[in-house]
């Protein structure tokens, strides 16, 4: 087992500073080798703090070159074990070390063998598995811990079903996967006392395969009750009885120690219960700490259970979805004296498809990434009841791409013809079946809106809906109804149907269908089908040629409007003014030609497929998969035609059109989005549903619901605003620098960096800084990292390859740290306690004026800035502010680095939108003392 400490992450730039190797057999350590290494360069201060290795220690150590012979002799040809070992080997490979040694990665092994772990860092695994780990990030201790972890994982592998091990070994044999030998060794150990037959027979005998030789589930299909049958006349809720449960001394205080009675929570519960009883719609703004989830879940559960009704609860974020389904609802189920069922339903691509998994298993010659994902799935499969991707650790884009090959996908689904669905082993349809019998159905906004788009074919019929995080609803509807296309995507759709590779020679789905039909149809019928197929193939080639003309014309037209040398994507609205220019004429002609050819392909496919469906005397079962794919490709091309024809030739009044020139490769994409969302929400949600509750901590702008009401057409909804129970005057200091320039003035960035640095040093890190652009974020990160590093403060930065979840985890668990984020970090961040004591808002979060959707919608107002831009920014500002105080004991500082809150006519509206808190104005130089005094007071 080996571990290195290094001066940085890039082997080409940085060097090893300490190395430790442990030789072991089983649980016995045979020998150790350890040495500090002189990196022959400066060790960054942050790395010194992380590893505990000082510059003086490293300068007095031998060079790695002088240690090579000793290290090579010690390790010999033994297999090497390490946690994320490829990182260590990349440094050692520069010196020709260990090129021929087998390498076993305990990080990869743990992610396969322990699928239900929350995190896979060496220290977290050691803690969860009871392995005594010493000081983190000292190579001596990490190497010993890794050796012990490997033995624990080896023992875990031996406890797997032998058939699972054999299947992983069989699949790995045809790949270059480093862990194949590990599973071969485990199989050999397990098989010593077992008489083995063929792999297929073993899998069949152990229930891993079904009679078709396909992987199947390891659990019996659960017995479920029939779908709910709503009561003819709903029984009203007893509002007073429900409210009493939340009173001091009520059911909640008896069941949950530490429960606090909150009048705001009771008031919200009464409003929600009233909406259920009166079948009215409701807008509820409930400040942080109200406990709004219990305030709506309690009446929802009682109403649904009493009346055998479905109540759908929709959230915007996965975090809230998980909180509701895995914590709040189970708490209610334990507390309440009634039985009610809940289901969590996600988009279908979150569910494993066993038929597609089987197809991937049979492919052969699998890459190491594919093998890694297959091993994870095969180990996880016996324990899952849901087939939900969230239960499998897939950290890389490559692994998530492999999931895309095995997940449930409408383009590959055989529906009722699928054997797995017939046997009750389709995870997606089983999830839908559970939803049909559930009283509470938890979904996200995307699935809620997708159900509307497909005319309610995803969710069971329901009349009661609660939308949490409702401030995101307009954006969610916009995303759901938006369209995007580029040349590559359109060409791939056409190519999947057919592509001419030589005169008279084609490949693609149509060619496969022709070959598949030959033995199934008589000569005459096959000749007719082949002729129809050839007609469609020719239409595809015609569409392909005009596709090139279209995008060449677009490039020529848009080149006159692009700004050269920009490092970001440029979005250009396709307005009437743009279309009136002479250069657009060529685009319109090419667009007309392409969409007409595209319509010809769609019609040709329709006639071909209808003709084959009418051949009732022929058994075309063996062609079902090809026919299904052609149906779906035809449907996608039809949708593309329906969007592109108006975009290019016949624009519609209520649609926004734009083109994006992508900075990375300069390719062009075309986009559409709805101009007015409120009319759609009114038509498809408010009108058909009996009751809808929309709730969030931020629904009001400038003290009024007018903005959100107008955006969502929630004209008839009752409005309830509840303040937070938190004591903001005592817990929150709002500091407004008096000597910082406005954002568009010289020296603003320099002064903002200075203020942020002073605050972080005074607070010892513990700071979340929110930005409105990646450009400012990265400029700030470069400016402050060194200074804060010298103060032993770590800086975590969004957009540098680390996931949002990992950034938050690093921030929570690193005592002296700062997190710089934009976009998604303005909401959904929930860090309680001293880990987050300071919040910095770099700029007021106005939308980018050139954003096509923002610009087009702004034009519908008499005063776009005051009526649209300001209210929208205020809601975002309030969301950001809400990241600081998450509990009654939290205490902290909000620093706003945008002087416009005090100098512009609209600035006071931003301040007035916040809870009443302590405000200090003063020069930046006073900030450190003010911060220390405020934070030292304690809660």
Predicted regions, residues:
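Signature of the SF2 helicase/ATPase Hel1-core->accessory helical subdomain module
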Residues: 296, 322, 412-440, 444-596, ...
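Conserved pre-motif I regulatory segment
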Residues: 236-284
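A substrate-engagement module of RecA-like helicase motors
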Residues: 223-232, 239-250, 308-439, 508-534, ...
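Acidic, Mg2+-coordinating catalytic module of metal-dependent nucleases/exonucleases
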Residues: 79-95, 117, 121-189, 894
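Conserved non-catalytic scaffold segment of RNase H-like nuclease domains
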Residues: 1-102, 115-137
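Conserved RecA-like P-loop NTPase helicase motor core
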Residues: 737-747, 799-904
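Acidic two-metal-ion nuclease catalytic site recognized across multiple nuclease folds
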Residues: 151-238, 927
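A contiguous, basic/glycine-rich beta-loop/short-helix subdomain that forms a polymer-engagement track
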Residues: 404-439, 449-456, 598-740, 747-754, ...
């Amino acid at each position: 087992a080996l571990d290195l400490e290094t001066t940085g992450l890039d082997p080409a730039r940085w060097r090893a500073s300490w190395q430790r190797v442990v030789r072991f057999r089983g649980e016995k350590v045979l020998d150790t080798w350890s040495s500090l290494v002189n990196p022959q360069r400066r060790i960054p201060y942050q790395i010194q703090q992380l590893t505990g290795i000082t510059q003086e220690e490293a300068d007095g150590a031998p060079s790695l070159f002088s240690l090579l012979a000793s290290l090579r002799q010690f390790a010999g040809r033994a297999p090497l074990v390490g946690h994320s070992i490829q990182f260590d080997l990349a440094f050692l490979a520069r010196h020709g070390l260990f090129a021929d040694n087998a390498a076993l990665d305990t990080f990869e092994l743990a992610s396969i063998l322990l699928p239900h772990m929350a995190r896979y860092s060496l220290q977290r695994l050691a803690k969860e598995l009871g392995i005594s780990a010493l000081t983190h990030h000292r190579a001596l201790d990490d190497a010993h811990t890794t050796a012990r972890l490997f033995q624990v994982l080896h023992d875990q592998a031996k406890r797997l079903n032998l058939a699972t091990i054999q299947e992983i070994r069989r699949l790995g044999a045809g790949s270059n996967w480093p862990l194949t030998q590990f599973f071969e060794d485990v199989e050999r150990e397990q098989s010593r006392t077992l008489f083995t037959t063929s792999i297929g027979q073993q899998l069949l005998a152990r229930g891993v395969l079904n009679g078709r030789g396909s992987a199947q589930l390891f659990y019996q299909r659960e017995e479920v009750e029939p779908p709910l049958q709503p009561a003819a006349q709903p029984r009203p809720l007893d509002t007073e009885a429900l409210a009493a449960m939340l009173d001091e001394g009520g059911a909640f205080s008896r069941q949950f120690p530490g429960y606090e009675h909150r009048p705001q929570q009771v008031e919200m519960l009464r409003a929600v219960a009233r909406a259920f009883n009166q079948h009215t719609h409701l807008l509820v703004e409930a400040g942080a700490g109200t406990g709004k989830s219990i305030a709506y879940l309690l009446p929802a559960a009682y109403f649904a259970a009493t009346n055998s009704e479905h109540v759908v609860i929709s959230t915007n974020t996965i975090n809230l979805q998980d909180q509701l389904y895995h914590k709040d609802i189970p708490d209610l189920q334990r507390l309440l004296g009634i039985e009610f069922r809940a289901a969590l339903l996600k988009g279908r691509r979150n569910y494993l498809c066993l038929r597609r998994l089987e197809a991937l298993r049979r492919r052969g010659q699998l890459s190491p990434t594919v093998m890694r994902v297959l091993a994870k799935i095969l180990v996880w499969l016996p324990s899952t009841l849901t087939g939900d991707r969230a239960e499998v650790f897939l950290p890389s884009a490559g692994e998530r791409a492999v999931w895309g090959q095995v997940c449930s996908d409408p383009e590959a689904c055989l529906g009722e013809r699928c054997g797995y669905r017939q046997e009750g082993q389709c995870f997606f349809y089983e999830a839908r079946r559970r939803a049909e019998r559930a009283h509470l159905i938890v979904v996200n906004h995307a699935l809620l809106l997708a159900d509307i788009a497909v005319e309610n074919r995803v969710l069971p019929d329901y009349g009661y809906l609660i939308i949490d995080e409702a401030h995101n609803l307009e954006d969610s509807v916009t995303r759901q109804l938006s369209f995007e296309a580029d040349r590559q995507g359109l060409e791939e759709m056409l190519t999947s149907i057919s592509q001419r590779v030589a005169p008279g020679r084609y490949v693609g789905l149509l060619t496969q269908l022709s070959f598949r039909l030959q033995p199934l149809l008589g000569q005459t019928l096959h000749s007719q089908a082949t002729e129809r197929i050839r007609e469609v193939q020719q239409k595809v080639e015609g569409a392909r040629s005009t596709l090139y003309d279209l995008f060449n014309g677009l490039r020529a037209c848009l080149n006159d409007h692009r700004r050269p040398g920009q490092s970001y994507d440029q979005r250009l609205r396709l307005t009437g003014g743009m279309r009136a220019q002479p250069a657009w004429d060529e685009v319109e002609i090419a667009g007309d030609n392409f969409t007409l050819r595209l319509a010809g392909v769609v019609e040709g496919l329709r006639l071909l497929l209808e003709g084959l469906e009418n051949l009732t005397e022929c058994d075309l079962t063996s062609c079902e998969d090809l026919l299904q794919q052609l149906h779906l490709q035809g449907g996608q091309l039809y949708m593309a035609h329906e969007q592109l024809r108006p975009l290019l030739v016949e624009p519609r009044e209520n649609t926004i059109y734009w083109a994006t020139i992508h900075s990375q490769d300069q390719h062009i994409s075309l986009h559409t989005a709805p101009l007015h969302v409120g009319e759609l929400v009114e038509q498809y949600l408010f009108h058909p549903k009996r009751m809808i509750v929309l709730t969030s901590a931020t629904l009001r702008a400038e003290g009024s619901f007018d903005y959100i009401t107008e955006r969502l057409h929630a004209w008839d909804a009752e409005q309830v605003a509840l303040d937070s129970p938190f004591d903001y005057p005592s817990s929150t200091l709002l500091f407004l620098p008096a000597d910082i320039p406005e954002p568009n003035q010289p020296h603003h960035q320099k002064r903002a960096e200075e203020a942020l640095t002073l605050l972080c040093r005074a607070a010892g890190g513990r700071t979340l800084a929110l930005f409105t652009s990646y450009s400012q974020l990265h400029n700030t990160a470069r400016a402050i990292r060194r200074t804060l590093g010298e103060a032993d403060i770590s800086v975590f930065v969004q957009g540098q390859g680390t996931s949002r979840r990992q950034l938050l985890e690093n921030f929570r668990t690193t005592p002296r740290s700062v997190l710089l984020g934009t976009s998604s970090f303005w909401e959904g961040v929930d860090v309680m306690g001293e880990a987050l004591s300071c919040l910095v808002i770099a700029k007021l979060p106005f939308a980018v004026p050139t954003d096509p959707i923002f610009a087009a919608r702004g034009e519908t107002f008499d005063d776009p800035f005051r009526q649209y831009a300001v209210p929208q920014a205020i809601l975002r500002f309030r969301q950001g502010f809400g990241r600081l105080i998450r509990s009654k004991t939290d205490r902290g500082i909000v620093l706003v680095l945008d002087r416009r809150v005090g100098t512009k006519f609209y600035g006071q509206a931003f301040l007035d939108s916040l809870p009443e808190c302590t405000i200090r104005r003063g020069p930046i130089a006073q900030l450190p003392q003010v911060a220390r005094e405020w934070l030292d007071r304690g809660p």
